[in-house]
Amino acid sequence: MNHKSKKRIKEAKRSARPELKDSSDWTKHEYCKSFDLSHRSVKDNVERADVQRLSPEEFIQRFEKPYKPVVLLNVEDSWPAREKWTLERLKRKYRNQKFKCGEDNDGYSVKMKMKYYVEYLESTHDDSPLYIFDSSFGEHAKRRKLLEDYQVPLFFRDDLFQFAGEKRRPPYRWFVMGPARSGTGIHIDPLGTSAWNALVQGHKRWCLFPTHTPRELIKVTRDEGGNQQDEAITWFNVIYPRTQQSTWPDEFRPLEILQRPGETVFVPGGWWHVVLNLDTTIAVTQNFASTTNFPIVWHKTVRGRPKLSRKWYRILKQERPDIAAIADKVDLQESTGIASDSSSDSSSSSSSSSSDSDSEADSGSEGDAMTHRRKKRRTGGMMGNGDITSQDDCASKERSSSR
């Protein structure tokens, strides 16, 4: 690795994780030597369903309506990404394009050119390496070509947030790429949205917990995790062993997934989940509001993002009056029964145990780790309309930042 590559990588690491003061902090636990990344460590107890034998109506009835996680097979059979999304080809085609791999203390995106990131990925011994998690690739002239390499699966094309407008809607799609030991800490996706995560290369380890699981049971404390508190590998080192003990409550035992190349995980809204990369992985993930989960998403959006909800409703009234009619019937005083990873939705089932004071973070099914880390370092300001100024994953900052 040449001097320039080392310099760019060092700059990105310093900006994204300022709490790690020197290089030894990144390898303090020596997880690259000690942590078990083998497939045998995963129980893999979530149902799989072949999309070639599953109609959209069956998917809704069997999985989406009952909020049941599932691993879908053969979603990616026709995707060009299966051939195009390799380290070698991505490094060659996008070598000088910058991808987001973190956020600094002020919520600005930390970005790295693909050529430097691949060098980092192939050589790192970091306990929890930097992880490309880029939500703006679809808005960039060159990076948007990634959109041509995959199709939104048939079951997830009911994208109701499109009616909020592209500029105002929360970030919803991410290109995701990282080495072994990278990942995202335990979280619930924002605003009651559900998500799908399609893995093209590598293997991911998932743990999922039902929405009513007490957060204090599954969150790593500062005393336990130190400055690696929010990292996925810390969670698997600290919390996971407890879930396997006889004293762990049966109703809160995790679902586990060993996600393989070509498999797509469906994460229903409200489910806690944590994801660890077992080797180099490349994936795409999207969050969505559908006709099925709309009542809960609407409830949480009105409570957590009032300005967004007003604009969304105006357009729904014009374009989808059937959905606006559903919104009219939602009782905003009733609990949704679906937890939030923040206290903004005061009527949610998790509000009594929540310790966060910010509104719901706009991150994807794998993406809350960076957002939570930033929350602890700064407090977003409130605008007069009740929305948090750090809304939309600091989308306007991210798009204008060249860091």
UniProtKB/Swiss-Prot annotation:
It catalyses: L-lysyl-[protein] + 2-oxoglutarate + O2 = (5S)-5-hydroxy-L-lysyl-[protein] + succinate + CO2; N(omega),N(omega)'-dimethyl-L-arginyl-[protein] + 2 2-oxoglutarate + 2 O2 = L-arginyl-[protein] + 2 formaldehyde + 2 succinate + 2 CO2; N(omega),N(omega)'-dimethyl-L-arginyl-[protein] + 2-oxoglutarate + O2 = N(omega)-methyl-L-arginyl-[protein] + formaldehyde + succinate + CO2; a 5'-end methyltriphosphate-guanosine-ribonucleotide-snRNA + 2-oxoglutarate + O2 = a 5'-end triphospho-guanosine-ribonucleotide-snRNA + formaldehyde + succinate + CO2 + H(+). One of its GO terms (molecular function) is histone demethylase activity. Residues 1-11 have a biased composition (Basic residues). Its cofactor is Fe(2+). Coiled coil: none annotated. A motif (Nuclear localization signal 1) lies at residues 6-10. It comes from the Eukaryota. Residues 141-305 form the JmjC domain. Its EC number is 1.14.11.-. Fe cation binds at H187, D189, H273. Keywords: Chromatin regulator, Cytoplasm, Developmental protein, Differentiation, Dioxygenase, Iron, Metal-binding, mRNA processing, mRNA splicing, Nucleus, Oxidoreductase, RNA-binding, Transcription, Transcription regulation. Residues 1-23, 335-403 are annotated as: Disordered. A motif (Nuclear localization signal 2) lies at residues 91-95. Disruption phenotype: Fishes display an accumulation of a large number of dead apoptotic cells in whole early embryo. These cells interfere with embryonic cell migration. In addition, normal development of the somite, brain, heart and notochord are sequentially disrupted up to 24 hours post-fertilization. Residues 339-356 have a biased composition (Low complexity). Belongs to the JMJD6 family. Dioxygenase that can both act as a arginine demethylase and a lysyl-hydroxylase. Acts as a lysyl-hydroxylase that catalyzes 5-hydroxylation on specific lysine residues of target proteins such as u2af2/u2af65 and LUC7L2. Regulates RNA splicing by mediating 5-hydroxylation of u2af2/u2af65, affecting the pre-mRNA splicing activity of u2af2/u2af65. Hydroxylates its own N-terminus, which is required for homooligomerization. In addition to peptidyl-lysine 5-dioxygenase activity, may act as an RNA hydroxylase, as suggested by its ability to bind single strand RNA. This is Bifunctional arginine demethylase and lysyl-hydroxylase JMJD6. It comes from Danio rerio (Zebrafish).
